[in-house]
Amino acid sequence: MNEMLKEELLQSIREVKDYPKKGILFKDITTLLNYPKLFNKLIDALKKRYLALNIDFIVGIEARGFILGSAFAYALGVGFVPVRKKGKLPAHTLSQSYSLEYGSDSIEIHSDAFRGIKGVRVVLVDDLLATGGTALASLELIKALQAECIEACFLIGLKELPGIQLLEEHVKTFCLLEC
């Protein structure tokens, strides 16, 4: 990815202090979405990175991973699979719990998400990688469906948190922007 695109992306992402709680500097990608030409450049850059890898599906993590992932899947001409919070998917699901700072949560994927095909090649997508808990749980769901995660792809990776290092122990990880 070229440095000019990275700088444009950084400039388009709003930072919100003390959200969702005091001490957090939230990276809000919704402002990036207001710039269609820049968003197209982002999706084109991701397409270029993954086009030759014979990807079958993009797996997007709720909720902003849906925005990036569905546009990315469309650009590649592949299917999109959502990973959602527990109780949000209507058909039979597989569930995976993960730890939060104060407790735990669960995410789910439809058990037929990859149309019952084993060995499909997927890229896991989300807007931001912080601690890695949700991404690791998503990887477990992908593995449970006997799919191969080629890479986990994030718009932003937070260097001061353990997510990048933790995730790289399990899957090749790409963060377009490391902040």
UniProtKB/Swiss-Prot annotation:
What UniProt keywords are attached to this protein's entry?
A: Cytoplasm, Glycosyltransferase, Purine salvage, Transferase
What does the record give under GO molecular function? adenine binding; adenine phosphoribosyltransferase activity; AMP binding
According to its UniProt record, where is this protein mainly located?
cytoplasm
Localization annotation: Cytoplasm
What's the superkingdom here? Bacteria
Catalysed reaction(s) here are: AMP + diphosphate = 5-phospho-alpha-D-ribose 1-diphosphate + adenine
Q: Where is the signal peptide?
A: none
Biological role: Catalyzes a salvage reaction resulting in the formation of AMP, that is energically less costly than de novo synthesis.
Query: What is known about its subunit structure?
Result: Homodimer.
* HAMAP family xrefs: Aden_phosphoribosyltr (MF_00004)
User: Which family is it part of?
Assistant: Belongs to the purine/pyrimidine phosphoribosyltransferase family.
**Record protein name field:** Adenine phosphoribosyltransferase
| Organism for this UniProt entry | Helicobacter pylori (strain J99 / ATCC 700824)
Name of the gene encoding the protein in the UniProt record: apt
